[in-house]
Amino acid sequence: MAGHSKWANIQHRKGRQDEKRGKIWTRIIREITVAARAGGGDVSANPRLRLAIDKAKAANMPADRIKYNIDKATGNAEGLTYEEIRYEGYGIGGAAIIVDTMTDNRVRTVAEVRHAFSKYGGNMGTEGSVAFQFKHVGQLIFAPGTSEDKVMEVALEAGAEDVVTDEDGAIEVLTAPGDFEAVKNALEAAGLTPDAADVTMRPDVTIDLAGEDAERMQKLLDVIEDLDDVQEVYHNAAL
């Protein structure tokens, strides 16, 4: 199955993350904190915590820093309590945007997200206004040049739902959220390490943007992603 290229978007985001390592760590620590408080500190029994730890390792967070934050989240020490809130809205050309946040102050967060939408050409919507245009899936993306046949064989055998080849040769493996970890482990055991892997919100249909519209949309997305309380931003724009 062929699909739109996601490779440029991944490289753009990786470049920005390299520039903002401290902020990335802060977001991952929030994820570890929420996951550990919700499901406990036993990594073997907490898939969400395992995913957060994988992100921490990918961001080169030291093991002792990871352990400290798990212990802090599951111990008796006082700490911030984070609330998970999702916002939805529209960007340039009517593109759909989902913004997932973790916050200790929802009044501050909604004001910042709303301001970003309005200042940079978007519109904040109501709950459910765009989420129906996305599916909750596991997603693993391999660089152009990876063996499509090998990825497909291993992924489908491990329980993947689909393997998509993008127009630039990047390969996208899609799974049910509950099968994500098993498929990822099988691929890595076969020597196939994805360049990006996460449980995400994937758009059913993409909207093509080019030229000035694409630049404005990218600016809006970058501004939203830079907000302190924002964890993830999903959209259906093909930039």
Swiss-Prot record:
Keyword check for Glycoprotein, yes or no.
no
Name where it mostly resides. Answer: cytoplasm
Q: Where is the segment annotated Disordered?
A: 1-20
Q: Does the keyword Nucleotidyltransferase apply?
A: no
Tree of life domain? Bacteria
Kindly list the GO CC terms recorded for this protein.
cytosol
Localization annotation = Cytoplasm
Q: What InterPro entries does the record point to?
A: Integrase-like_N, TACO1_YebC-like_2nd/3rd_dom, TACO1_YebC_N, Transcrip_reg_TACO1-like, Transcrip_reg_TACO1-like_dom3, YebC-like
Q: Which UniProt keywords apply?
A: Cytoplasm, DNA-binding, Transcription, Transcription regulation
Any GO MF annotation of the entry: DNA binding
The UniProt entry's GO biological process terms, in alphabetical order, are: regulation of DNA-templated transcription
Task: Name the protein family.
Answer: Belongs to the TACO1 family.
Q: What is this protein called?
A: Probable transcriptional regulatory protein Aave_3203
Q: What organism is the protein native to?
A: Paracidovorax citrulli (strain AAC00-1) (Acidovorax citrulli)
